Regions:
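Catalytic, metal-anchored helix/loop core of enzyme active sites in primary metabolism
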Residues: 1-185
Length: 185
């Protein structure tokens, strides 16, 4: 669909998850992926050229890690944020069936897991992941700007695709480099 004409009510509908307005909009324009890459970088510092964003429409695989020894590990769980939150709080020592009605499942009847590359023309927001974004206060500027823009979109003040256009303008602004790249005192 033409993103320019997407209304807040449409952007909030997620096919697999029930989430709040803000995170649903971040998911619909792929800002959630941008924020996830920044989060991964902060937790596990890596060369910013060494990541790849992929889409998993089934929303069951939440992370994939490729190891130098040739192994690959997947983090697979149902579309319920209770699972990662409970495991973080209880340090992976929780029987999730006590908290959730969902049981662990795996694709049935030979159903395969599907993955696809992000179409950067359709989701240009992922192009904001330049090396500058990882530096010092870059993530803070991105997140704060996005918060304001999503709120403006929800209130009908800007269009859906304006979120990206304004964010891009922020990161192209000469003052971004002036403030974001400096180390905090």
């Amino acid at each position: 669909k033409d993103f320019k004409n997407i209304k807040p009510k449409e952007a909030i509908k997620h096919p697999n998850w029930q989430m709040g307005k803000k995170i649903s909009i971040d998911s619909s324009n792929m800002m959630n992926k941008v924020l996830e890459v920044i989060e991964a970088f902060k937790l596990f510092p890596f060369n910013p050229d060494k990541y790849k964003i992929i889409i998993h429409p089934q929303s069951l695989v939440h992370a994939i890690v490729f190891f130098k020894n040739g192994q690959t590990k997947f983090l697979y769980h149902e579309t319920d944020m209770l699972i990662p939150i409970a495991n973080a709080i209880y340090e992976n020592k929780i029987d999730i069936e006590i908290l959730s009605r969902k049981k662990n499942s795996f694709p049935k009847n030979g159903q395969s897991l599907k993955f696809q590359e992000i179409d950067k023309k359709r989701f240009p927001i992922v192009t904001l992941l330049s090396k500058n974004i990882f530096q010092n206060s870059g993530p803070i500027i991105l997140n704060a700007s996005n918060e304001v823009l999503v709120d403006s979109f929800i209130k009908g003040k800007i269009t859906f695709n304006s979120i990206y256009l304004y964010l891009r303008a922020v990161f192209r602004d000469k003052d971004f480099r002036k403030y974001a790249i400096k180390k905090a005192p």
